[in-house]
Curated annotation (Swiss-Prot):
Enzyme class: ligase
Superkingdom field: Bacteria
Gene Ontology terms: biological process: modified amino acid biosynthetic process
Ranges where the record places region Disordered: 392-413
Gene3D superfamilies in the cross-refs: 3.30.590.20
Role according to the record: ATP-dependent carboxylate-amine ligase which exhibits weak glutamate--cysteine ligase activity.
Listed name of the protein: Putative glutamate--cysteine ligase 2
Organism encoding this protein: Bordetella parapertussis (strain 12822 / ATCC BAA-587 / NCTC 13253)
GO molecular function, one term: ATP binding
Family annotation (InterPro entries): GCL_type2/YbdK_subfam, GCS2, Gln_synth/guanido_kin_cat_dom, YbdK
EC number: 6.3.2.2
Amino acid sequence: MEQIPFVSSAPNTLGIELELQLVDPRSFDLAAASDELLAQLANHPIADRVKPEITRSMIELNSSVHEHPAGLLAEMREMRDVLCEAADAVGVGVTGGGAHPFMRWQDRAISDTPRFQYLAEMYGYLARQFTVFGQHIHLGVPSGDAAVRMVRGLSPYVPHFIALSAASPYCEGVDTLFSCCRLNAVNSFPLAGHMPADVTDWYRFEAHLAQLRASGLAESIKDLYWDIRPKPEYGTVEIRVCDTPLTVERACQLAAFAQALAVQVARDPEPSQQAWLAYRSNHFQACRFGLHGSYVTPDGQRVRLVDHLRALFDRLAPVAEELGTGDMLQTLRDEILRNGNDARWLRGQFLKVRELPLVVESMAQNWRGQGVQDTPPSAVRRRIRATSEPVGGVCALSTPQGDPLPGWAERLH
């Protein structure tokens, strides 16, 4: 059995990847402009942190590695501004969000790289439907065994990440009734899901991958579309279930949440095998209903996800204070419990403007850090409407009461 080397990283370090939408600034449909944008950035210092994605209407923005989410936020704001300036120069807009509200998968063009061309040939139309946009959060760990333990410890909290980040209620011009429809595209792939429950250490992980290779089911770890997976060449654990948020501020808040949770689960007893029993059901509830979903705890209790999340924020508060991230976690908690997630915001925007291109226009404004302005709409009036799920009252969610580091920085792209 082939051994897989694991590059040791400093614990509690973090970095993120953001998959971003490229849009036409008049119609606000997706624009196949990644080649032009990458060429525009070719001589810029951030050029090696902006990568093509599977279709030409996408790019991936990669951070360096940080000890503290405040340093991450400063870097992401700087890269966002550079990216928007370059996008303006080539005549495209950039937005966050987990799915474009009205794009047609048939119109997508596959990026011209060997891996993406292979995926298109292997998976057919699924490759074009994979024009969805996620945030991946990387957490540094010292060893393969530590990585497997962290994957197991974080797995019961996958629904919390989904609900916090959900930003894909619309697909191909209709309200899907899901808070996060993006993961339905991800789950179409045969090796999607979670790390097998019987993988309890790095040796068993190596053995599992060896079995997949021997059976012709996978060639590398890249073929494992797990919700959370080890990334041995980076020395990280990679959380892959988050929709790309509408702002870099929310993206960095989610990274701070992940960092604090990783510290907490390292101190907690490892979840029992029973924790895997409701994994798929919990996953569905978070995708479909977001914060309003139900959640079955590792010990079998059925609760409201928002109540469990509120209690989790309270439990993480002392850890966040230790890490110096208390303000970021408190801001995330307050904004989520008061206003809901980005999916709720997008539905609220649709109720105001009544046309999905105008929703995308507001997404582009948010990404730039401008907020939504009360200015006359500029989108070409392609009439694309969607029946919107009732937003509901915010009170339903309310309670009554630094610098880049060496190491895997240069590998995170």
